[in-house]
């Protein structure tokens, strides 16, 4: 928000930073949860788009949620904090994998999608419930056999619509679901040389959805060779 921002450093430490009118750092406080240690070098965390006081952080195969990060005062401290954190009682099925990407919904609120380091995608339908199950929505066919999920993007107008990006070279890179992960379609279109994902296509890294009007949307994909745009998602025929 306008009073403070969050940033992380390598190894997963998350810092709440207070900024002054000139955008300069006035004070800071470390806020990542006590008990969380299995962080990646660059560790995923996101703010909830509906309630910015809710924070989601991955830790290996686990998910941590802070239900009200605003209560942690900024006093230049550098210790992990216990306030309002819980670890979801469930975790991704293969604990040798780790959560590599997070995507949260606007409408309805508090749905969370998780991507992993080895092709799997999960859905949590109530992220504020510490016992909410992680539903495996990975298709039995179609996804890369061992792809790395680098981005999960949820349509802010409809939480049933979600994109998954695989950043590996030589695999099909972009999938889209309109039914909360029940089915998936390939939508990388002309960004792939072949429909299998083989060939000289770039590595896709991220996707962002920008609603324009009630009937139009802009989609942006970040790749190893630049930024691409489309306004129409049309399965294999999508033109970026």
PLM region descriptions:
Residues 8, 16-21, 45, 65-68, ...:
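Conserved Ser/Thr-centered positions that define the repeating blades of beta-propeller domains
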Residues 157-160, 165-172, 191-232:
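Loop/turn-rich, solvent-exposed surfaces of beta-rich toroidal or solenoidal domains
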Residues 4, 53-54, 111, 161, ...:
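Conserved core beta-strand positions within WD40 beta-propeller blades
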Residues 27-37, 78-95, 137-143, 189-199:
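Surface-exposed loop and turn segments in beta-propeller and other repeat-based domains
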Residues 1, 38-50, 95-107, 151-158, ...:
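Structural signature of eukaryotic scaffold interfaces centered on beta-propeller domains
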Residues 22-29, 71-79, 129-136, 182-185, ...:
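Beta-strand initiation motifs
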